[in-house]
Design a protein with these regions (language model features):
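Conserved phosphate- and dinucleotide-binding cores of soluble alpha/beta proteins
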Residues: 1-118
Length: 118
């Protein structure tokens, strides 16, 4: 899952570990350091149960595998969010735009409630 600030949880669902982190951090770090390098996190917009993979906040207990400052792009079937160099509000807008349409209003409400977006 991805939080509206851009941080990524890739190894757990809440407190339940479902995989290792693999090389995600190394890939993101290497891409950021490479001249002209770009990194992408590709996810479906929803879980198999129909829940949004883009969330206002990561689920309680979720581990941050990739911090927000390392994430450059997030891709869903609805487009690409360009996060590098963006403010928290801009990041939230970009991520909401690629969230499943059924969750965009709720994500916008949560972002405004938390002061991420005005």
């Amino acid at each position: 899952e991805v939080g509206l600030a851009g941080q990524v949880c890739a190894d757990s669902v809440g407190m339940r570990i479902i995989s290792g982190v693999g090389g995600q951090h190394d890939f993101m770090y290497g891409g950021a350091l490479s001249e002209g390098g770009k990194t992408f996190i590709a996810i479906p917009s929803t879980t198999p149960k129909g829940e949004s993979k883009i969330r206002a906040l990561l689920s309680p207990g979720a581990g941050v595998v990739t911090t927000r400052h390392m994430v450059q792009h997030v891709v869903t079937e609805y487009g690409v969010a360009h996060l590098r160099g963006r403010s928290l509000g801009e990041r939230a807008r970009q991520l909401i735009a690629i969230a499943h349409p059924d969750f965009r209003d709720e994500l916008t409400f949560e972002a405004k409630k938390r002061g991420i977006m005005i």
